[in-house]
Amino acid sequence: MSIGLLCCAALSLLWAGPVNAGVTQTPKFQVLKTGQSMTLQCAQDMNHEYMSWYRQDPGMGLRLIHYSVGAGITDQGEVPNGYNVSRSTTEDFPLRLLSAAPSQTSVYFCASSY
């Protein structure tokens, strides 16, 4: 590949502009004291039926906490203890941490798909 073609490809990506990810997770960062509760919000605007919450602990892969296959339908994943979820609409799937423990220090991810 020539340098000229590579530069054009890089510039094309830069000019593409921002893209809406379709899934919004808030808050981005949160620090809790042991015993505190909190809710992580997850919203998607793509009309996806499937939504899921994952956690990734240091040195480990993603582990499924809870998932949903449609509004009003939720189920437990691999590590559901200490968490509650609800799915009153297709768009929203909040994850509630009931009582923070040091073992729940993790990176949390929400995902959606068809």
Swiss-Prot record:
Keyword Disulfide bond: yes
GO (cellular component) term, any one: T cell receptor complex
Highest taxon in the source lineage: Eukaryota
InterPro entries recorded: Ig-like_dom, Ig-like_dom_sf, Ig-like_fold, Ig_V-set, TCR_beta_variable
GO BP: adaptive immune response; cell surface receptor signaling pathway
Signal peptide residues on this chain, from the entry's feature table: 1-21
Keywords for the protein's UniProt record, in alphabetical order: Adaptive immunity, Cell membrane, Disulfide bond, Glycoprotein, Immunity, Immunoglobulin domain, Membrane, Receptor, Signal, T cell receptor
Keyword Secreted found: no
Disulphide-bonded residues: 42-110
Annotated Gene3D superfamilies: Immunoglobulins (2.60.40.10)
Subcellular location: Cell membrane
Glycosylation sites: 84
Ranges of residues in domain Ig-like: 22-114
Known function: V region of the variable domain of T cell receptor (TR) beta chain that participates in the antigen recognition. Alpha-beta T cell receptors are antigen specific receptors which are essential to the immune response and are present on the cell surface of T lymphocytes. Recognize peptide-major histocompatibility (MH) (pMH) complexes that are displayed by antigen presenting cells (APC), a prerequisite for efficient T cell adaptive immunity against pathogens.
Subunit structure of this chain's protein: Alpha-beta TR is a heterodimer composed of an alpha and beta chain; disulfide-linked. The alpha-beta TR is associated with the transmembrane signaling CD3 coreceptor proteins to form the TR-CD3 (TcR or TCR). The assembly of alpha-beta TR heterodimers with CD3 occurs in the endoplasmic reticulum where a single alpha-beta TR heterodimer associates with one CD3D-CD3E heterodimer, one CD3G-CD3E heterodimer and one CD247 homodimer forming a stable octameric structure. CD3D-CD3E and CD3G-CD3E heterodimers preferentially associate with TR alpha and TR beta chains, respectively.
PANTHER family according to UniProt: T CELL RECEPTOR BETA VARIABLE 6-2-RELATED (PTHR23268:SF19), T-CELL RECEPTOR BETA CHAIN (PTHR23268)
Protein name: T cell receptor beta variable 6-5
Species assigned in the record: Homo sapiens
Annotated gene: TRBV6-5
